[in-house]
Amino acid sequence: MVTQSVEDSSRSGPRRTIVGDLLKPLNSEYGKVAPGWGTTPFMGVAMALFAIFLSIILEIYNSSVLLDGISVS
């Protein structure tokens, strides 16, 4: 037969790199969930600010009445 077996030396495990060593502490908390609400309020604030940003862009692009009370010079 022509089959070959893979040598054990090629299975030495994962290589260590500088980037991997720098990023490993960021992955140490993987799978753990903070008790309570965590960062949910911050996500809500970020979503609200993003919605305001999108409505401003829509106002500039479409000249709609969504922000009719705000004057644009």
UniProtKB/Swiss-Prot annotation:
Q: What is this protein called?
A: Photosystem II reaction center protein H
Q: Tell me which Gene Ontology terms the entry assigns under biological process.
A: photosynthesis; protein stabilization
Q: Which residues form a coiled coil?
A: none
Which GO-annotated molecular functions does the record name? phosphate ion binding
Ordered alphabetically, the record's keywords are: Chloroplast, Membrane, Phosphoprotein, Photosynthesis, Photosystem II, Plastid, Thylakoid, Transmembrane, Transmembrane helix
Q: What does this protein do?
A: One of the components of the core complex of photosystem II (PSII), required for its stability and/or assembly. PSII is a light-driven water:plastoquinone oxidoreductase that uses light energy to abstract electrons from H(2)O, generating O(2) and a proton gradient subsequently used for ATP formation. It consists of a core antenna complex that captures photons, and an electron transfer chain that converts photonic excitation into a charge separation.
Which family does the record assign?
A: Belongs to the PsbH family.
Q: Name one GO cellular component term.
A: photosystem II
Location in or out of the cell: Plastid, Chloroplast thylakoid membrane
NCBIfam families linked to this entry: PRK02624.1
Topology versus the membrane? Single-pass membrane protein
The subunit structure is: PSII is composed of 1 copy each of membrane proteins PsbA, PsbB, PsbC, PsbD, PsbE, PsbF, PsbH, PsbI, PsbJ, PsbK, PsbL, PsbM, PsbT, PsbX, PsbY, PsbZ, Psb30/Ycf12, at least 3 peripheral proteins of the oxygen-evolving complex and a large number of cofactors. It forms dimeric complexes.
A Pfam match is PsbH
Q: How does the record describe the protein's post-translational processing?
A: Phosphorylation is a light-dependent reaction catalyzed by a membrane-bound kinase; phosphorylation occurs on Thr residue(s) in the N-terminus of the protein.
Which positions carry Phosphothreonine?
Answer: 3
Q: What is its main location?
A: plastid
Q: So where does this one cross the membrane?
A: 41-61
Gene name, Swiss-Prot/TrEMBL? psbH
